[in-house]
Amino acid sequence: MNRLPLLVAQTVLVLAALSAFGWVVKHRTKGDLDLGWGNVVVDQLAGFPDLFKKSVKEAQTLPQTYVPTPDGFDPINRLTEDVLALSAYSNEDEDRNIDLWNLRTGDVVHRWTLRRDVLDFKVHRRVHHPLLLEDKSVVSFITGREPLFRLDSASNMVWRQDSLLFHHAINLDAEGHIWACVQKFEKGGPWTAYRARYEMDGKTVHFLDNSIARIHPETGHIEYVKSCVDILKENGLEHLVLRSGDPMDPLHLNDVEPALFSGPFFEEGDVFLSFRNLQAVLQFRPSTGEVVRVIDGPLAAQHDVDVLSDSTLVIFNNATQENVGRYTHTAHKYPVSKEQALLKHWYSHVVEYDLASDTFTPLHEELVREHEIMTFSEGLQEPLPDGSYFVEEQNSGVLWVLGDDDVLYKDVLASHHKGHHHLPNWTRIISSFP
């Protein structure tokens, strides 16, 4: 059978349909054709190429506040008790929502919105580690930039503090004042610089200093600032800066955790300082300027230290060298031997530190190995009342609740961009909403 006439007929019909559709679009654009309910269909079909182009461009240029969601990602929710989580993310207007939501139900309990017309920031900037106050206001900051700010329960700006660069973490002390990881600005402008140096073999090594600051929650006024380099120098600990593999950023302060009560090993008002690149946590007493204890051992690029009891701390141990996530073996030119010593496969995990015995106990070893939990930077844990732990695997954007021998929760913050979820910004677990 000769199919040529059929093919010609089909081609003519397709061309006729395209011609008719083109004519309809032309006159819809000119505004002299009304198809009633058909207008919506025609307009959507005509706009599809623009929509497709926009989607491709969007996928190629998404801010780094979004993370690709793996194909086949399978959430888990076995929670039997409510877990309230506070975190910030980018909304469809590229403003920042700060949501308090229930991990068990997925319900949003309260939402604050930081609008870009109120506080100007670029689309890839992150609103970090929000802190809930008793009057339902929140304090947060643009990480690595100024300011620290407070929003009331209706998202109105209460105050802003622009005199320091805020980064990583903020926490409340027993008096309700805010402790923050900061860097000081140079005089004359809002920028930071190498504020410390040491000499070695005729060379001068300039490096970044960090500081800790205490902020009044009602006014945002700075009450106290202390250089971390000065803390080391005044306590005979200058040698610690030589431990780091990054000579320009040897400290990298990433948490300041106040002790809310006194115990046999610390006093109320002590602060525990986590330094990623020192591979150590320092117990510092601001009232006397004394470093009470240097906590090191099987810690590597750790983040987040919490006081669990009067004798125990918990620390999020990233268990990585600071640059392994950035470089691969191709950075080195040595050949690979056929006979290699094999060390363990490392995963990020929570570790308990006993202040009495100076010993470390890793938690959830089998679970983190089974689920390959790993974040080269950032990451945190929060102990929950039932003995389980909330864990933020920050680089992948996966949120976990780990029981003693089972995963109770695993999910991501779904975004309005298909195939992508939100990068978490140091989620805080809240015991109750005021």
For the regions a language model picked out, list residue spans one by one.
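Histidine-/acidic-rich catalytic cores in large beta-rich domains
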Residues: 6-434
